[in-house]
C-alpha cells in the first residue's frame, strides 16, 4: 500500500505541474489582457525587415506582419485597444530579452535554428533568407574562394559568424573576421574600407546597399552560403501564444496579403528615404507561404 506521505507528495507534484502548465500556456495572452499592452522586439537597421524610420518609430516587412498578428489577437481577446511598445534589440540580446519576458514577440531577422529553439519558440516562417557576400563593385571578389587573406565583416551574435567559420574550414580559405555591433556598423566596415566583404542575409545586404550614398559602388556576389528561415520569435514556454500567432499568420496568408506585403517592402520605395531594395520573391519564400511550417535552418540545408 502506498504511504500517506507518498500520496501527499504525488498530489502536490501534480498540482504544481498543473499550475505551471496553466501559467505557461497563457502567460503572454493574460499579460496582454491585464495590461492592455504588448512589447514588440524590433531591429534598428535591418532594412527592409525591421528598422527605425526615426523619432522612435519602427517599420518593415516583419514589423507590419507582427502588427497584423497582434491586431488579430487583440480582436480574439475581445480587447478594444492594444498598445504596442517597441523595444529595440540586437543580435546579442534578442534571445535573452524574449526569455526573460522583456519582449513578448520579436519581429526582426532571427534565424530559426535548433540551437536557438532550445531557448525560444518560433512562429511559422514567412521569409526564407539566402546568406550572400557583399563587396565593393571594383573589388574583383566573385566568390568565397576570393576572400583568402581578406578582411570579412559580419555582425556579432548572428548565425553568419558560425557560417563563415564553417566555410573557412571546409574550403581551406583563411580570412580575418571583423565584427560590427549591428548590421549598419558591419556595412560601415565595408564602406570605409576596413573590411573587403560583408557576409549576411541577402535582404540586409540589399537594404544597406540601397540605403548607401552610392549604391552602384557595391554588389552582391558568389554562391548562396546558406538558406535560413527567418521567423518571428516568442517564448518557448507559451504554446498558447505561439498558436495564436500562427493562427493569425494562417489568416494573413489565406487572405492573400503576402504578395502585397512583399511588393511593398522589397520592390517599392520605402520610408524614410524612399529607397527600393529590389529583392525579388524567391521560390523558397513562396513555398514557405504555401506550406506553413516552423522547420529550423538545419532542415533547409540538408544535403
Model-found features: residue ranges?
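A structural signal for short loop-to-beta-strand junctions that line the ligand-binding cleft
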Residues: 29, 109, 117-126, 220-222, ...
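Bilobed "Venus flytrap"/periplasmic-binding protein-like clamshell domains
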Residues: 39-48, 58-75, 111, 128-183, ...
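Extracytoplasmic small-molecule ligand-binding "clamshell" domains
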Residues: 24-106
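A ligand-binding cleft/hinge motif common to bilobed small-molecule-binding domains
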Residues: 93, 107-118, 163-170, 188-192, ...
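Extended ligand-binding regions for polar small-molecule ligands
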Residues: 64-72, 145, 150-151, 156-158, ...
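Ligand-binding clefts/hinges and TM-proximal coupling segments of bilobed small-molecule sensing domains
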Residues: 33, 162-178, 216-218, 249-303
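Acidic, polar ligand-binding/catalytic clefts
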Residues: 79-146, 286-297
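Periplasmic-binding protein-like
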Residues: 44, 127-138, 202, 210-249, ...
Amino acid at each position: 500500500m502506498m504511504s500517506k506521505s507518498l500520496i501527499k507528495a504525488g498530489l502536490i507534484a501534480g498540482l504544481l505541474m498543473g499550475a505551471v502548465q496553466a501559467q505557461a500556456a497563457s502567460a503572454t495572452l493574460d499579460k496582454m489582457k491585464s495590461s492592455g499592452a504588448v512589447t514588440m522586439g524590433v531591429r534598428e537597421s535591418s532594412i527592409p525587415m525591421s528598422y527605425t524610420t526615426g523619432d522612435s518609430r519602427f517599420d518593415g516587412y516583419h514589423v507590419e506582419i507582427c502588427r497584423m498578428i497582434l491586431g488579430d489577437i487583440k480582436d480574439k481577446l475581445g480587447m478594444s485597444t492594444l498598445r504596442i511598445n517597441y523595444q529595440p534589440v540586437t543580435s546579442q540580446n534578442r534571445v535573452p530579452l524574449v526569455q526573460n519576458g522583456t519582449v513578448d514577440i520579436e519581429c526582426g531577422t532571427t534565424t530559426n535554428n535548433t540551437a536557438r529553439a532550445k531557448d525560444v519558440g518560433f512562429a511559422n516562417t514567412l521569409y526564407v533568407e539566402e546568406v550572400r557576400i557583399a563587396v565593393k563593385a571594383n573589388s574583383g571578389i566573385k566568390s568565397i574562394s576570393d576572400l583568402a587573406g581578406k578582411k570579412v565583416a559580419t555582425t556579432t551574435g548572428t548565425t553568419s559568424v558560425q557560417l563563415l567559420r564553417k566555410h573557412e574550414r571546409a574550403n581551406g580559405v583563411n580570412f580575418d573576421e571583423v565584427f560590427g555591433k549591428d548590421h549598419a556598423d558591419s556595412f560601415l566596415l565595408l564602406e570605409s574600407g576596413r573590411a573587403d566583404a560583408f557576409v549576411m542575409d541577402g535582404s540586409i545586404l540589399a537594404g544597406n546597399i540601397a540605403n548607401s550614398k552610392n549604391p552602384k559602388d557595391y554588389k552582391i556576389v558568389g554562391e548562396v552560403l546558406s538558406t535560413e528561415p527567418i521567423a518571428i520569435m516568442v517564448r518557448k514556454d507559451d504554446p498558447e501564444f505561439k498558436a495564436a500567432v500562427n493562427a493569425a499568420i494562417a489568416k494573413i496568408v489565406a487572405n492573400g496579403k503576402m504578395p502585397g506585403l512583399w511588393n511593398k517592402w522589397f520592390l517599392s520605395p520605402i520610408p524614410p528615404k524612399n529607397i527600393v531594395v529590389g529583392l525579388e520573391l524567391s521560390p523558397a519564400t513562396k513555398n514557405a507561404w504555401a506550406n506553413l511550417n516552423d522547420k529550423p535552418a538545419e532542415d533547409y540545408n540538408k544535403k
